[in-house]
């Protein structure tokens, strides 16, 4: 399911109470809270790897058990829909807990498309290859 980044930027208003999107040079793409990690570059980034952010045990366990796992658009869509089942699936631990209690009930693909647009490492995962027909 392809998302609409422009719609996702508007929908991100629900996320900015806890998250910002700030470029490495300090430019605020979306000013937001610091309860959650900065989401600039999240697509293609290793799980729970935002420098200086204090992650919860559940997401740290995902990173520990899956050291090469990076956020894909598909995983982010699943995660923002309901973080707990995603954590349980990735850790194999039914008691896994999340610090992110918010659940995004609709327009997840749009929000993730917006995040991918602000993720330089999203690479091929985020953009369909258009050169194949040449």
From Swiss-Prot:
The function of this protein is: Electron donor for nitrous-oxide reductase.
| This protein's record includes keyword Iron | yes
Q: Does the keyword Lyase apply?
A: no
What does the entry list as the binding residues for heme c?
A: 15, 18-19, 100
Supply the alphabetized keyword list. Answer: Electron transport, Heme, Iron, Metal-binding, Pyrrolidone carboxylic acid, Transport
Source organism per UniProt: Paracoccus pantotrophus
Query: InterPro entries annotated for this entry?
Result: Cyt_c-like_dom, Cyt_c-like_dom_sf, Cyt_c_1A/1B
Indicate what this protein is called per its UniProt record: Cytochrome c-550
Q: In this chain, where does the modification Pyrrolidone carboxylic acid occur?
A: 1
Question: What GO molecular function terms would the record report?
Answer: electron transfer activity; heme binding; metal ion binding
Q: Organism classification, top ranks?
A: Bacteria, Pseudomonadati, Pseudomonadota, Alphaproteobacteria, Rhodobacterales
Could you state what the record's PTM comment says about this protein? Binds 1 heme c group covalently per subunit.
């Amino acid at each position: 399911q392809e998302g609409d980044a422009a719609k996702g930027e508007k929908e991100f208003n629900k996320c900015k109470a806890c998250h910002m999107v700030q470029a490495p040079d300090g430019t605020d793409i979306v000013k937001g809270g610091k309860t959650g990690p900065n989401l600039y570059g999240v697509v293609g980034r290793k799980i729970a790897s935002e420098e200086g952010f204090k992650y919860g045990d559940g997401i740290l366990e995902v990173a520990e058990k899956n050291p090469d796992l990076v956020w894909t658009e598909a995983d982010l869509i699943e995660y923002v829909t309901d973080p707990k089942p995603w954590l349980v699936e990735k850790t194999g631990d039914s008691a896994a807990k999340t610090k992110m209690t918010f659940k995004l009930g609709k327009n997840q693909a749009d929000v993730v498309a917006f995040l991918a647009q602000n993720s330089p490492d999203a690479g091929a995962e985020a953009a369909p290859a258009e050169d194949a027909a040449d």
